[in-house]
Curated annotation (Swiss-Prot):
NDH is composed of at least 16 different subunits, 5 of which are encoded in the nucleus. Signal peptide: none annotated. The gene is ndhG. It catalyses: a plastoquinone + NADH + (n+1) H(+)(in) = a plastoquinol + NAD(+) + n H(+)(out); a plastoquinone + NADPH + (n+1) H(+)(in) = a plastoquinol + NADP(+) + n H(+)(out). This is NAD(P)H-quinone oxidoreductase subunit 6, chloroplastic. Belongs to the complex I subunit 6 family. Keywords: Chloroplast, Membrane, NAD, NADP, Plastid, Plastoquinone, Quinone, Thylakoid, Translocase, Transmembrane, Transmembrane helix, Transport. NDH shuttles electrons from NAD(P)H:plastoquinone, via FMN and iron-sulfur (Fe-S) centers, to quinones in the photosynthetic chain and possibly in a chloroplast respiratory chain. The immediate electron acceptor for the enzyme in this species is believed to be plastoquinone. Couples the redox reaction to proton translocation, and thus conserves the redox energy in a proton gradient. InterPro entries: NADH_UbQ/plastoQ_OxRdtase_su6, Nuo/plastoQ_OxRdtase_6_NuoJ. Its EC number is 7.1.1.-. It is a multi-pass membrane protein. One of its GO terms (cellular component) is chloroplast thylakoid membrane. The chain crosses the membrane at residues 8-28, 30-50, 58-78, 98-118, 150-170. One of its GO terms (molecular function) is NADH dehydrogenase (ubiquinone) activity.
């Protein structure tokens, strides 16, 4: 009986994933497409939950349904602005200062990444990881995020920070232009 209910749940989730994907593709209104994308992401998260991967399900909801879908809606709201003329863009001295500061910061980060002996760190962490016994897969994933996968994890957080700063700059420019 349990297998039959799991199979019915699987078919229902597949149906919602299919309908959500069709809604994303066929709706002319982009807001409705974003909402159907959220439905698709949520259905995939429930599918992960049905397959027994609770962590992946929660991560799907937090990252895709929460963050990515909200980001898409904000992008849609920003895209629907009238076109601007490129001759309106002028360079001011503060742009040169911020370019220099960002270039120095970028050069420092690249130098740190290149000069760090990553091979030694990874080999040392692999030995520690094999000797530990984790009680849950979530603890193992967390340990790997903060040990062997720390560089991609930090680069992803830096990318998200840059996107957030860019969104704030765009919003402030529009606020200044409106007043």
């Amino acid at each position: 009986m349990l297998e039959q209910s799991a199979q019915i749940t699987l078919f229902v989730l597949d149906f919602f994933i299919f309908v959500g994907a069709l809604g994303v593709v066929f709706f002319n209104n982009i807001i409705y497409s974003a909402l159907f994308l959220g439905l698709t992401f949520l259905s995939v998260a429930l599918l992960y939950l049905l397959l027994g991967s609770e962590f992946l399900s929660v991560a799907q909801v937090i990252i895709y349904v929460g963050a990515i879908n909200v980001l898409i809606v904000f992008a849609i709201m920003l895209v629907n602005k009238p076109e601007f003329d490129k001759k309106d863009m002028i360079w001011v001295p503060i742009d040169l200062k911020s370019f220099c500061v960002n270039f120095i910061l970028f050069s420092t980060i690249v130098t740190m990444i290149v000069t760090t002996p990553w091979k030694l760190l990874v080999n040392n962490i692999d030995v520690k990881l094999n000797s530990l016994n984790f009680l849950s897969p979530i603890a193992k994933i967390g340990y790997q995020f903060l040990s062997t996968l720390v560089l991609p994890f930090e680069l992803l957080s830096l990318l998200l920070l840059i996107a957030l700063i860019g969104a704030v700059i765009i919003a402030r420019r529009e606020l200044i232009e409106d007043t």
